[in-house]
Amino acid sequence: MSLREILNNRRAVRHFDPAKPLDAEVVKDCIEQATLAPTSSNLQLWEAYHVTDKKVMEQLSKACLDQLSTRSAQQIVVFVTRQSLYKQHAKAVLAEGIEEIKRNSPAEKQEKRIKKQTLYHAKLIPFIYSRGFGLWGLVRKVLAQGVGLFRPITRQVSESDMRVVVHKSCGLAVQTFMLAMSEAGYDTCPLEGFDSLLVKKALYLPHDCEINMVLPCGIRLPDGVRGERFRLPFEEQYHRI
């Protein structure tokens, strides 16, 4: 399928065929394709939980208010954010960045580029992503507003702003996963209606992660898609300047 065909094929499917199982390895491959999605500063602060155990799926369905999509799902994938891992991920990104500079940059420019990478990932990232009862976010906000009086600067740096950044990055991975599933001939239904505490309990998730999306997966039944696709007029959403 072309990209346009994949996009048109992807729908939020509410009812899956119980007679058509999914190949778990294909679903796993679609999750691996999701790792190709871009994330802010390449920190990749998300994880995916691929659930095939029927007992756990029943618990997840209950946590998702027993919607038909989860009750009829063949498998369920849960995407979560892991903002608390920013230090470990920044360290890994920095290490690879330094090695890449050594491999591909001219010798006379390596020191300067390594210093720049180190400043960003070892100093700036920890400062931007650190949390402490909203206080660090307030400090960053005040600094940003002050600097912004003299030059352009990113102003969305509060703790709640950074939480949004992490969820946006995870959302890009979720969309990539759904499109990969569509290409494979599988269907999904992105859910935001769930009891996050019950989802975390069912998956034994650490307290500091957050649920971004629950995606029941399967192959659609004829009644699985509710109605024709509706989109607002393109002219209302497109602005050319």
Spans of features found by a protein language model:
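Acidic, surface-exposed loops and disordered segments
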Residues: 1-241
